[in-house]
C-alpha cells in the first residue's frame, strides 16, 4: 500500500472554503479503483492548515491517480490558495487499509 500524508497551509481567507474547494477532487479520487482512503482533517492548532491522509493499493494505482484529469486540475488551481509549499510523506507500507489500535477500547456505556 502507498501511504501519503500531505500538509497544506491555505490562505487564511480561503480556509473556511477549503472543504468545498476540494470536494470535487476528493470525490473523484475516492472513486478511483486503486484508492483505499482519502481523508482531510483540519489542524486544531493552525486553522488554515489541512492534512490529507491518503492511500492507494500500489504504485500503479498511485500513478493512475497523478495522471488523472482531476489531479492535474487540482495541481493547476491550488497554487493560488496555498501560502507555503505543501509538505509530504510518501511511503510504501504493508497492509491494505486501516487496522484497529490495540491499546484502546471504548468504555462501555452505563
Residue spans for each PLM region:
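Intrinsically disordered, low-complexity acidic/polar segments
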Residues: 15-17, 49, 61, 97
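N-terminal/domain-start segments enriched in small and hydrophobic, helix-friendly residues
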Residues: 2, 7, 21, 25, ...
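N-terminal first-folded block
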Residues: 2-40
Amino acid at each position: 500500500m502507498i501511504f501519503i500524508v500531505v500538509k497544506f497551509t491555505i490562505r487564511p481567507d480561503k480556509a473556511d472554503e477549503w472543504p468545498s474547494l476540494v470536494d470535487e477532487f476528493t470525490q473523484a479520487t475516492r472513486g478511483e479503483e486503486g484508492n483505499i482512503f482519502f481523508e482531510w482533517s483540519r489542524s486544531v492548532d493552525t486553522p488554515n492548515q489541512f492534512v490529507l491522509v491518503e492511500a492507494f493499493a500500489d504504485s500503479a494505482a498511485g500513478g493512475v491517480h497523478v495522471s488523472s484529469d482531476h489531479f492535474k486540475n487540482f495541481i493547476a488551481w491550488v497554487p493560488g490558495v496555498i501560502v507555503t509549499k505543501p509538505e509530504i510523506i510518501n511511503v510504501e507500507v504493508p497492509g491494505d487499509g486501516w487496522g484497529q489500535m490495540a491499546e484502546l477500547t471504548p468504555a462501555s456505556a452505563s
